[in-house]
Swiss-Prot record:
Keywords: ATP-binding, Calcium, Calcium transport, Cell membrane, Ion transport, Magnesium, Membrane, Metal-binding, Nucleotide-binding, Phosphoprotein, Translocase, Transmembrane, Transmembrane helix, Transport
Classification via PANTHER family: CALCIUM-TRANSPORTING ATPASE
Annotated SUPFAM superfamilies: Calcium ATPase, transduction domain A, Calcium ATPase, transmembrane domain M, HAD-like
Entry GO MF terms: ATP binding; ATP hydrolysis activity; metal ion binding; P-type calcium transporter activity
Main enzyme class: translocase
Designated name of the protein: Calcium-transporting ATPase CtpE
Major location (coarse): membrane
Entry keyword annotation includes Transferase: no
EC number: 7.2.2.10
Entry keyword annotation includes Ion transport: yes
InterPro entries (UniProt xref): ATPase_P-typ_cyto_dom_N, ATPase_P-typ_P_site, ATPase_P-typ_TM_dom_sf, ATPase_P-typ_transduc_dom_A_sf, HAD-like_sf, HAD_sf, P_typ_ATPase, P_typ_ATPase_HD_dom
Catalytic activity, reaction form: Ca(2+)(in) + ATP + H2O = Ca(2+)(out) + ADP + phosphate + H(+)
Length: 791
């Protein structure tokens, strides 16, 4: 149908609407600004703790003892760089949001930015044009609109004059114009985007667990700090500078500062690896989140199926050149729809006939055709329209269609296709059976999730039969339900979701309700989607996964964006998440062992200092300065932890992170702390000690600490592979070199020259290592865990 051209607004009318604020001001999408990203990564609990201690150390003038302050920069930089990179990528992807509509005004027809559209503007449409605001069609020529990003319905919808069009949809055929009736925040797509516009952080057990540990340590630092300050300043004869440095030396190792850094590095490396697979991660912990998911809600269109269809069968009903006819019809269609494009792909050798008349496809008539003179008049379309619905051929087509397939009838007509009463009498020639093009990797992806005990729910706006057919072909078995029959009550909805696998005719609000219902049953839910209709469900799910070709709103709220639109990338994301979770849990034992022995040492030294004040015994200096605890962490924790955090690890993700790591770290830390304190007491010469003797006592304590801590590393590195053994051996060798090189001894304030003291310290350290080994085997037996030394 063709309608008359509508006049556009005058310049005065446009100016008036701008003055009244009736413009298309699109809501800010759900993403943090650069300043918000910087604030979130700089002003953290651990940076605050380290920052205060760093300033205290600098006040003493000892720069070398402030080396731990570099961690403040590293902790912040990794998170900032990654999030800003993700933000920049998303901004570049927002092409749809920058589509330039063509408006018709008194001053002429011109392309403008979406934000420059005003209420009542006449906006022209052509194939592929984005509809940027809600409106009403005022003129059309065979206009068809794809609203799949809004409704999930894959089939294009014919639009006549007076019909509404919604922002977020686009033109697939024909041309026309519409009048803007709702702009800015009143538009449909903008309302969904605004409802989802508040930024929310992804849930992370690792992040939450580490924050709980840091919170506890923060509370612990106050009494421990006061005790250490008092004993070092008021019970010893050391000057304020020496006392302050040893106080900081007691407090710094209590903070598992490297754990936050190592977690960020492990996540960042995972992000880089996934980036090579065209997977954009908006937030670092999203990798962990997907590894913990036990239900994936997958949108059928664009996730399990590709855009387009394929010919799955051709049922010839008469003798003749059916393939030639199909090839010629497809070749002559200048703007083929999905069905004709599939036929063109299947039949690529047209006979070269000349067309004498054509009839384009219209949704209202549901057929198209071409007349070829002596070669006949050929039509193709819906069987129940071209034939009597009660005819055997139409009934056969209906039976095939009930399997979720699309069926077209190819037939010859007794009159030209441009005749007023066309198509006339149609003689059936063939049934063309089409099916949605299934992604070649979708089946393997679903098999992977099944093997990992992850349930997959297929959700779509298409009819339930079609959705169920696609799921069945992919080996996803289970009951199919039409979402129009879903119960409204959350409890009953949750029960239905547990029983059924595929859902058709799902509304956008139902997708969100389905996510909530699954979460109410304790499930960790991932949601995949690409349209505006998926935005709220993506936002409320535990992990939102958007397609790169989808709407800008869906990409903004999702934690993970698949830039190449491949559902098959998700198993790699799960694998990276498992690597991060398993390895961070492993290296957490190293960092928290240090926290435990540091707290124990501070308490024991504090008690010793109070005893000196009460009973008049020799005062007790804290054994270490900040540089000592810094080098102690280099090769017992820092570098080995970094290497271990990047190692392959495909263990299933489990909950209870804090409980498990503390169960391992607490006994090890107590052993290391006790052994170090005993070694220090043996070597300590009391009030009369010379500076050299005090340095030798500190060195002895450090040797004991290193010997026992290195065995903690040896235990954490199990089960051994050749490179893990080499890692532990190199760590041991590094400390041998540090203690052997005179320049290093002077720089790090070490003196191992008293062989008697050094030998005793080493012996105590080896005894601590032996006890740690025994505890590891005992813990395995008590917890019922298999202990393996070698892989």
């Amino acid at each position: 149908m063709t309608t008359m051209a509508a006049a556009g607004l005058t310049d005065a009318e446009v100016a008036q609407r701008i003055a009244e604020g009736k413009t298309n001001d699109v809501p800010t999408r759900a993403a943090r600004t650069v300043s918000e990203i910087v604030r979130a990564n700089v002003f953290t609990r651990i940076n605050a703790i380290l920052g205060v201690l760093f300033v205290i150390v600098l006040s003493t003038g000892s720069v070398i003892n402030g080396a731990f302050g570099l961690l403040i920069i590293a902790n912040s930089a990794i998170g900032i760089i990654q999030e800003i990179r993700a933000k920049q990528t998303l901004d570049k992807l927002a092409i749809v949001g920058q589509a330039k509509p063509t408006v018709r005004r008194q001053s002429g027809t011109r392309a403008v930015l979406p934000s420059e559209v005003v209420l009542d503007d006449i906006i022209e449409l052509g194939p592929g044009d984005q509809i940027v605001v809600d409106g009403e069609v005022v003129e059309e020529t065979n206009l068809e609109v794809d609203e799949s990003l809004l409704t999930g319905e894959a089939d294009p919808i014919a639009k006549d004059a007076g019909d509404p069009v919604m922002s977020g949809s686009f033109v697939v055929a024909g041309s026309g114009a519409y009048r803007a009736t709702k702009v800015g925040r009143e538009a449909y797509a903008a309302k969904l985007a605004e409802e989802a516009s508040k930024f929310t952080l992804v849930k992370s057990e690792l992040r939450n667990g580490i924050n709980k540990i840091l919170q506890f340590i923060t509370y612990l630092l106050v009494p421990a700090g006061l005790l250490t300050i008092y004993t070092q300043l008021f019970t010893t004869d050391a000057g304020w500078r020496e006392a302050v440095l040893r106080m900081v030396g007691a407090l710094v190792p209590m903070v598992p500062e490297g754990l936050v850094l190592m977690t960020s590095i492990a996540f960042a490396v995972g992000v880089v690896r996934l980036g090579r697979r065209q997977c954009l991660v908006n937030e670092l912990p999203a990798i962990e989140g997907l590894a913990r998911v036990d239900v994936v809600c997958a949108d059928k269109t664009g996730t399990l199926t590709e855009n387009g269809m394929r010919v799955s069968d051709l049922k010839s009903l008469t003798e003749g050149h059916v393939a030639d006819v199909l090839a010629q019809l497809a070749s002559d269609d200048a703007r083929p729809n999905a069905s004709m494009a599939a036929i063109a792909e299947a039949y690529q050798t047209p006979p070269g006939w000349s067309a004498t008349a054509t009839a384009p496809f219209k949704s209202a008539t549901k057929w198209s055709g071409t007349s070829y003179g002596e070669h006949g008049n050929w039509v193709i379309g819906a069987p129940d329209v071209l034939l009597d619905p009660a005819s055997p051929v139409a009934e056969e087509a209906e039976r095939i269609g009930a399997q979720g397939l699309r069926v077209l009838l190819l037939g010859s007509s007794d009159r030209s296709v441009d005749a007023p009463d066309a198509p006339g009498v149609v003689t059936p020639a063939a049934l063309v059976v089409l099916e949605q093009r299934i992604r070649p990797d979708a089946g393997d992806t679903l098999d992977y999730f099944a093997s990992q005990h992850v349930s997959v729910k297929v959700i779509s706006g298409d009819n339930a039969v079609s959705v169920g057919a696609v799921a069945g072909k992919l080996g996803l078995h289970g009951e199919t339900m039409d979402a129009r029959r879903l119960p409204e009550q959350p409890e009953k909805l949750a029960e239905t979701l547990e029983e059924c696998t595929t859902f058709g005719r799902v509304r956008p609000d139902q997708k969100r309700a389905m996510v909530h219902a699954l979460q109410s049953r304790g499930h960790t839910v991932a949601m995949t989607g690409d349209g505006v209709n998926d935005v709220l469900a993506l936002k409320d799910s535990d992990i939102g996964v958007a397609m790169g070709s989808g709407s800008s709103a869906s990409r903004a709220v999702a934690q993970i964006v698949l830039l190449d639109n491949k559902f098959a990338t998700l198993p790699y994301v799960v694998g990276e998440g498992r690597r991060v979770i398993g390895n961070i849990e492993r290296v957490s034992n190293l960092f928290l062992t240090k926290t435990v022995y540091s707290v124990l040492l501070a308490i024991l030294v504090g008690i010793g200092g109070l005893s000196a004040k009460i009973f008049g015994t020799d005062p007790l200096l804290f054994p270490f300065q900040p540089i000592h605890v810094t080098i102690a962490a280099w090769f017992t924790i820092g570098i080995p932890a970094f290497i271990l955090s990047l190692a392959p690890n495909n263990e299933r993700a489990k909950t209870g992170f804090v409980r498990r790591v503390m169960t391992a770290a607490l006994p090890s830390g107590l052993v290391v702390g006790t052994a170090t304190f005993v070694s220090y007491l043996v070597a300590y010469q009391g009030r009369e000690a010379t500076p050299v003797e005090q340095t030798q006592a500190s060195t002895a304590a450090l040797i004991t600490l290193l010997a026992s801590s290195l065995w903690v590393l040896a235990v954490v590195a199990r089960p051994y592979q050749w490179w893990r053994v080499l890692l532990v051996a190199c760590s041991m060798l590094a400390y041998v070199l540090i203690f052997s090189i005179p320049l290093a001894q002077e720089l790090f304030m070490l003196d191992p020259t008293n062989m008697k003291v050094t030998s005793v310290a080493l012996g105590i350290g080896l005894a601590g290592a032996a006890l740690i080994e025994v505890l590891w085997w005992v813990q395995g037996r008590v917890l019922g865990e298999e202990r393996r030394v070698w892989r």
